[in-house]
């Protein structure tokens, strides 16, 4: 949605609501709206929209993955687990489901479970940048700094090979946040802000930004984006 890319949160919500009014049975409209209000920390509303999307399209990996995110932060932990497991049973290589699973684990400080989930995802695609960045983050959280830095090196290699089509800055943000290098994390986060990367919309809810949560630089980014803050951030 254009309004979300422009960080016009009210306008984006109006667009999503209008899309649902035009076609109430369109699962993608409902899960997209769920993702939007999840980013705004309206977790129970997001879970309700995600549940309706699942009813409309029960086998969609995209729908089930983001339902898993919405359910988790609405306190429906078992529903979240079931949704994500459903995705990975049908499509084990669907890395977004592994990422959401891992982020949910990080929220609960279940770091070993997160590591297993991400390592499994890498068996299907060993160069998936977001999985590498998330795993580097978790390695940092458990003191495996050298292992995390090796993954940062791999990310740099992948980025360099892309030439004029650089990858998203977010894998670096996650990695450096977990490894305790806040200055580098904010260098890449600022780059993501300047590029208006889609993952910026989750600034208030991303557990992999947990180590940055109290930093004034994160608060400044939230302010510049005009992101509403409706509840305490999730742990991370």
Q: What do these predicted ranges mean?
A:
Residues 3:
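Membrane-interface transmembrane helices that cradle and orient dolichyl/undecaprenyl
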């Amino acid at each position: 949605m254009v309004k979300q890319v422009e960080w016009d949160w009210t306008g984006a919500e109006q667009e999503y609501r209008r899309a649902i009014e035009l076609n109430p049975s369109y699962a993608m409209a409902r899960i997209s709206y769920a993702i939007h209000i999840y980013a705004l920390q309206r977790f129970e509303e997001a879970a309700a929209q995600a549940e309706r999307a699942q009813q409309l399209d029960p086998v969609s990996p995209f729908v089930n993955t983001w339902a898993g995110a919405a359910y988790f932060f609405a306190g429906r932990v078992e529903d979240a687990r079931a949704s994500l497991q459903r995705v990975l049973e049908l499509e084990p290589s669907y890395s977004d489901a592994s990422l959401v699973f891992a982020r949910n684990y990080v929220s609960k400080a279940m770091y070993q479970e997160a590591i297993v989930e991400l390592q499994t995802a890498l068996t299907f695609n060993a160069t998936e940048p977001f999985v590498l960045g998330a795993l580097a983050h978790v390695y940092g959280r458990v003191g495996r700094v050298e292992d995390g830095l090796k993954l940062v090196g791999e990310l740099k290699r992948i980025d360099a090979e892309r030439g004029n089509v650089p990858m998203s800055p977010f894998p670096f943000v996650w990695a450096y946040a977990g490894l305790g290098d806040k200055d580098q994390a904010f260098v890449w986060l600022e780059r993501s802000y300047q590029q208006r990367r889609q993952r910026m919309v989750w600034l208030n809810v991303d557990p992999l930004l947990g180590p940055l949560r109290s930093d004034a630089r994160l608060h400044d980014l939230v302010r510049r984006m005009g992101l509403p803050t409706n509840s305490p951030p999730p742990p991370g």
